[in-house]
């Protein structure tokens, strides 16, 4: 049997980017900090992310037909921490809205506006695949996660 703490520690040796995934809910926009993001396909343009099933926000994201994945910039540590603790991001977030009424966060390194393409079971997580309909990039350096902590490049 694999020790989960040791497994998590080993996974922490892999540097990942940090994202904030947002969607609209019946109570307004919500978000979740996630490092389980990956590109999947160029044609069609697909990305994926994996929310934990134990999260109170999991089911809302699983039902969402649209969502936006934000690549956090190196100055957005507090924003990422806020979304780790609160669905609405607390006072740290200033919501903006696109033409379709979807909430997003400005000044990220990149932003991918997606429609849900599919979802799959992934153990204690779900795997949500999104088809990218629009994206935007900036010159901001991304925030990264390594060894269980946020860090800069």
Predicted segments — roles?
Residues 1-153:
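Basic, polyanion-binding surface patches
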């Amino acid at each position: 049997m694999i020790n989960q703490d040791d497994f998590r520690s080993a996974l922490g040796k892999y540097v990942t980017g940090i994202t904030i995934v947002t969607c609209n809910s019946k109570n307004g926009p919500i978000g979740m900090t996630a490092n389980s993001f990956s590109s999947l396909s160029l044609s069609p343009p697909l990305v994926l992310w994996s929310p934990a099933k134990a999260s109170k926000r999991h089911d809302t994201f699983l039902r969402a037909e649209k969502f936006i994945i934000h690549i956090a910039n190196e100055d957005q540590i507090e924003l990422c921490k806020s979304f780790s603790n609160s669905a609405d991001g607390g006072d740290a977030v200033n919501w903006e809205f696109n033409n379709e009424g979807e909430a997003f966060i400005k000044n990220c390194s990149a932003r991918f506006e997606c429609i849900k393409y599919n979802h799959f079971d992934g153990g204690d997580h779900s795997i949500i695949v999104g088809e990218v309909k629009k994206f935007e990039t900036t010159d901001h350096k991304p925030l990264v996660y390594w060894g269980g902590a946020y860090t800069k490049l």
